[in-house]
């Protein structure tokens, strides 16, 4: 009986080790691809440099992930030290990096362009337009460049009587 339990224990420990190894390999594959995507996309959006850094490279599940970014003509910063617009661009670069690795069927963004200046809104709108060939985007925005890049526009207005008017138009109409 003890021998049987001992063998079963060894089998279970071997399976656990196998799955832990598989988990680590899958993570490293995903992290490597997403990290490369992030560096490229961040450079496209900001003309700067950015990279993803694991807090504990030996055991990535024991720590977190940090963004080390250098927007054009600025010093290297962590995410917490960036302006609102720089944080938005960094976060969107990360989302787009994951999207390129494993696309989702649709994305819902609520005023992601709020903290951005006009030229950055145009860059984000252009990137979303390109990615929209693979995934659908539902975006709430008040910014003209984002609205102008849409295939369909839904306007929502509150009337004086507090009721809501919803109108749909095709872009370019």
Language model regions located:
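Terminal ABC-like ATPase head and other globular end-domains that cap long coiled-coil arms
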Residues: 1-173
């Amino acid at each position: 009986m003890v021998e049987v339990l001992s063998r079963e224990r060894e089998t279970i420990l071997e399976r656990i080790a196998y799955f832990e190894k598989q988990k680590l390999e899958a993570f490293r594959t995903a992290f490597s691809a997403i990290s490369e995507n992030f560096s490229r996309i961040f450079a496209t959006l900001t003309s700067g440099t950015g990279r993803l850094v694991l807090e504990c490279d030996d055991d990535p599940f024991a720590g977190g992930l940090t963004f080390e970014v250098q927007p054009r003509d600025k010093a290297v910063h962590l995410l917490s030290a960036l302006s609102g617009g720089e944080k938005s661009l960094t976060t969107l670069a990360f989302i787009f990096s994951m999207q390129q690795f494993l696309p989702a069927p649709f994305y819902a963004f609520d005023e992601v362009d709020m903290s951005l200046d006009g030229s950055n809104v145009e860059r984000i709108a252009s990137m979303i337009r390109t990615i929209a060939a693979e995934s659908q985007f539902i975006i709430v925005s008040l910014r003209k460049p984002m609205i102008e890049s849409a295939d369909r526009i839904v306007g929502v207005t509150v009337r004086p009587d507090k009721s809501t008017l919803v109108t749909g138009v095709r872009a370019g109409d």
